[in-house]
């Protein structure tokens, strides 16, 4: 009888926190600056420089820990992780090994195939990021940008509770949404503000011992993570979609950790924890439940709208301004999602103002513009954030509500299409659809289809 094996997966997720300054100095954390412009003696490891802990980093770490059902260590310390690499100017990284800020938590995940389970959080610790190596193939050299050096990170270390790529993606999505809703990070994988190391082993089903662990590092997209789980202990190259041999998986002794002598322990009071807990915002699950009960949205719509914090914010602000939750949901679920797909954009990248969407919804409800024209206007809102009232006025898109003008146009259409008139009067109800279409075409889409239908039936009944 052949043996059955299972994959055992754990993750180390690195998240850049959304502080304005670095973890141990006052340098900016803004992404995209010119190389080596956001640096100082502290984050470049100059002799004699001393670190000062950023309080906001501690509070973000606590907030994430509480949202992930972790215990908060009320006495935590920083340690030096010693290694030599060009992007590490100090030759050590300030991290937390012995007393991390959070431990023993869990999050509940649900996969696309409907599997529900809890994934344990072993610990969350604070640390500083390294610089960035830039490889110049033309000059055959490597350059170092220290702007990222000292940017605050939390590392979320899971228990080895996942068994498939599907579960891993569900876990990462759960973490991403928790952290985004807390405002602790934007979790933009393409900018490196969320990265994952994947630890994989294989063992017999039912065995308690783990197999030899392998590690995939430098993975910053969910697609790449799914691919990487097929690999072994190597460094994932996203450009080549392959892995390459790296150093073996290190243990703590390889880094010669010791307590950082320049940083005092962090003492966290019960009152501080209570204040952070009280300030926790509504997270994705609670928001989704509220959308269903308060706005009477279908569960599917609530899931999609809350799957991006930015999308949820746009929805709520639009509803606040126009008071029409179902219409706001429909525009975002149908037209916005269509345009996002066409432009290959993420919902977090939508740049239009909720006020303009709310105004468009109100204009449709007031009969100032029909839905067909409104779709064209929404595209302009989506792409250029135009004011719909101004755009409609400039382009002459307002609905023609002049009954006399509509009747005159319809009479011309009836005169030009005697066969369709005869078909309708002969009992072919579908013939009126053709006549409505011809009228709308003649009016360049600026007529109210309902009024056109009503007037056509009145004139055909004569």
Region roles according to the model:
Residues 3, 296, 319-328, 366-369, ...:
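Structural motif
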Residues 168, 302, 328, 374, ...:
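Small-residue helix-packing motif on alpha-helices
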Residues 191-204, 255, 292-314, 325-342, ...:
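Core structural elements
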Residues 18, 312, 316, 333-341, ...:
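Amphipathic alpha-helical core segments of compact helical bundles
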Residues 1-282, 299, 320-324, 334:
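Basic, nucleic-acid-interacting segments
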Residues 321-322, 328, 336-350, 359-364, ...:
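M16/insulysin-pitrilysin zinc metalloprotease superfamily fold
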Residues 3, 146-151, 189-196, 205-206, ...:
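C-terminal non-catalytic interaction appendages of large macromolecular assemblies
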Residues 347-358, 362, 371-441:
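Strongly charged, low-complexity linkers/loops
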């Amino acid at each position: 009888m052949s043996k059955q094996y299972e994959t055992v997966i754990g993750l180390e997720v690195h998240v850049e926190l959304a502080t304005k300054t670095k973890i141990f100095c006052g340098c900016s954390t803004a992404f995209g600056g010119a190389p080596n412009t956001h640096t100082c003696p502290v984050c470049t490891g100059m002799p004699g420089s001393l670190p000062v802990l950023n309080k906001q980093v501690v509070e973000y770490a606590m907030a994430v820990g509480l949202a992930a059902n972790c215990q908060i260590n009320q006495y935590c310390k920083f340690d030096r992780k010693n290694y030599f690499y060009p992007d590490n100017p100090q030759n050590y990284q300030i991290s937390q090994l012995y007393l991390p800020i959070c431990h023993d938590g869990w999050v509940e995940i649900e996969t696309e195939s409907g599997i529900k389970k809890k994934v344990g959080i072993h610990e969350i610790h604070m640390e500083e990021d390294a610089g960035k190596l830039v490889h110049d193939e033309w000059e055959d050299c490597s350059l170092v940008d220290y702007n990222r050096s000292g940017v605050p990170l939390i590392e979320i270390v899971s228990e080895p509770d996942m068994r498939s790529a599907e579960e891993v993606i569900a876990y990462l999505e759960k973490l991403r949404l928790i952290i985004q809703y807390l405002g602790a990070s934007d979790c933009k994988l393409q900018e490196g503000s969320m990265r994952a190391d994947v630890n994989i082993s294989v063992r017999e089903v039912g065995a308690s011992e783990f197999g030899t662990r392998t590690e995939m590092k430098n993975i910053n997209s969910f697609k790449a993570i799914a691919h990487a789980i097929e690999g072994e202990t190597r460094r994932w190259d996203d450009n080549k979609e392959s892995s390459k041999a790296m150093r073996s998986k290190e243990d703590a002794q390889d880094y010669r950790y010791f307590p950082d002598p320049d940083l005092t322990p962090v003492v966290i009071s019960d009152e501080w924890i209570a204040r952070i807990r009280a300030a926790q915002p509504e997270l994705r699950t609670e928001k989704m439940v509220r959308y269903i009960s308060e706005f009477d949205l279908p569960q599917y719509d609530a899931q999609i709208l809350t799957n991006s914090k930015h999308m949820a914010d746009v929805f709520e602000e639009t509803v606040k301004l126009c008071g029409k939750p179902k219409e706001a949901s429909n525009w975002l679920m149908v037209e916005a999602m269509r345009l996002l797909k066409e432009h290959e954009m993420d919902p977090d990248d939508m740049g239009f103002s909720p006020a303009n969407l709310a105004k468009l919804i109100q204009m449709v409800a007031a009969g100032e513009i029909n839905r067909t024209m409104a779709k064209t206007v929404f595209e302009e809102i989506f792409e250029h954030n135009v004011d719909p009232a101004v755009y409609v006025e400039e382009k002459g898109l307002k609905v023609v509500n002049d009954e006399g003008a509509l009747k005159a146009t319809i009479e011309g259409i009836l005169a030009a299409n005697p066969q369709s008139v005869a078909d309708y009067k002969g009992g072919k109800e579908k013939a009126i659809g053709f006549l409505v279409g011809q009228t709308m075409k003649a009016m360049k889409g600026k007529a109210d289809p309902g009024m056109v239908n009503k007037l056509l039936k009145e004139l055909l009944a004569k």
